[in-house]
Structure formats: C-alpha cells, structure tokens
Amino acid sequence: MILRFPEQLKNSWRRESEDFLGVVPESEQAKETLSLSQPASRCPSCGVPIKPWHNIPLISYVFLRGKCRACSTAISMQYPLVELLSGLATAFIVYQFGLSLMAGYCLIFTWVLISLTGIDFREQLLPDQITLPLLWLGLFANLSGIFVPLNEAVIGALGGYLSLWSVFWLFKLITGKEGMGYGDFKLLAALGAWMGWQMLPLIIILSTFVGALVGIVGLLMKTREKQVPMAFGPFLAMAGWIALIWGDKILGSYLSVFGL
C-alpha cells in the first residue's frame, strides 16, 4: 500500500496527461496496469517476483537476512518496521476492545493511518482517495454514535478542516509561503469526523509539539536541512491514534488538574 498506491496514482496521472496531450507511451512499462494486488510483489531493485514464502511479514525478512533472494540487495527497513507496527497495533486494539464492532472500526482507522504515515513520509502526499473515505467512514460509524454523537462528528469534520485551512492562509499571507498541504486539512477533518470537535485541540497541540520537537532535533543533529519541508501528516496520524485510544483519559486528567 505505502509503496504501490503512490505509484498507481503516478501511473494514472501519467496516462491522463498522455491522453490529453495525445502522447504515445515510451515503454511497455508505462502501459502496465498497476493495482494494489497486480502484478505480484517483486524486488524494486532487480524486478524478480517475490515468492509467497519469501513474502511473509517479518519472518521472511529475518529468514532472508534483510536481503533480496535473487540479487542480494538490502531490503528497506521500512518493510519490517511497518509490518511490526501494524502487528503490534492490531494486537493492542483487539486486546483493548475485544472482538467488537468498535474494534473493527479501530482496526481500519489504525491501518489507514499507518498507510497515510508511510505515504506522506516518503512522498509528502496525503491522497484524497484515502483521506476522504476515512472521513466518510468516521461519519458513518457515528450515525449510531459508536465514538461520538453525529452532530459532534460533523462539527469535528468542519472544524478540523477549517482550523488548518485558516492557519495555512494566515501563514501564507504573512510569509508568502505555503506551510502545509491541503491533505493535512482533510486528514484533520477525518480525525474530527471520528472523534468529534472536542478532540481537535488535543490532536493539534500534540501533533504540533511532536512535529516541532522532531524538526528541531533533526536540525541540531543535521539529519535534515532547514529549507527541506517536513511532512506533517505522520504527526497528525500519531496524535489522532493516541486521541482515539486515550483521548478521554488525557482530557480528563488535564481538566482534573484545574478542578473542572
């Protein structure tokens, strides 16, 4: 998903541009139909198809010692990290909520956020094809008030979008630069649709704090350049997941400090 879906989008945009301009594709690869299931997984370095028993999450990575069986090229650490994170998060959700409808929704929410995190980290892109269905699924879940009442979910979606939209234009008016992408607005709108408007301040504060901390540490350690933009989506996703699982407890603890 993280690697293939952006390539699928690029191929689609390329074909649309070629059709519009009347350009003939330069290679057979450009004509190849790419989907999430076809063609079968293959090494990005040598192109050799990966056998099913070499494609088992985590186990195959350890068995192959982190290298392609065909060309011995090192396999990106992103694969086992995503597999490990997905497995741990899935186990935690099932442990926390049991085999319930809420657990099912939480699992979908978790897997989508992991995918968006990986895509935005690699491509600085939050595809509408993922963020908008996530938003509508949140509203659908809250038709029956699984997480929050529907009116709070609708206000959360509107508030999530408009809050970052306002920050975007204020920053652009002051600096003449774009501080974030429209995908960030839509992701926060989706999070608001799932958890309601009450969780938006927590999500914004937590994501901004962690994002700023990571950015400062990166600059101090010289692992990133000052002028290179940093994806904000992963921090929104992380804050959103924390808010879904522990948001009520965090807000309760915060309010109790002030006797509210």
Where are these regions (language model features)?
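Conserved post-catalytic alpha-helical subdomain immediately downstream of the catalytic base
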Residues: 198-228
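Interfacial loop-to-transmembrane junctions
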Residues: 182-183, 217-242
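C-terminal ends of transmembrane helices
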Residues: 1-4, 65-70, 113-123, 166-178, ...
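Alpha-helical membrane-inserting segments
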Residues: 2, 89, 93, 97, ...
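Membrane-proximal soluble regions of multi-pass membrane proteins
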Residues: 1-78, 232
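C-terminal domain-closing interface element
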Residues: 238-260
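Multi-pass membrane catalytic core of lipid/isoprenoid biosynthesis enzymes
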Residues: 47-106, 183-185, 189-190
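Functional transmembrane core segments of multi-pass inner-membrane proteins
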Residues: 102-210, 252-260
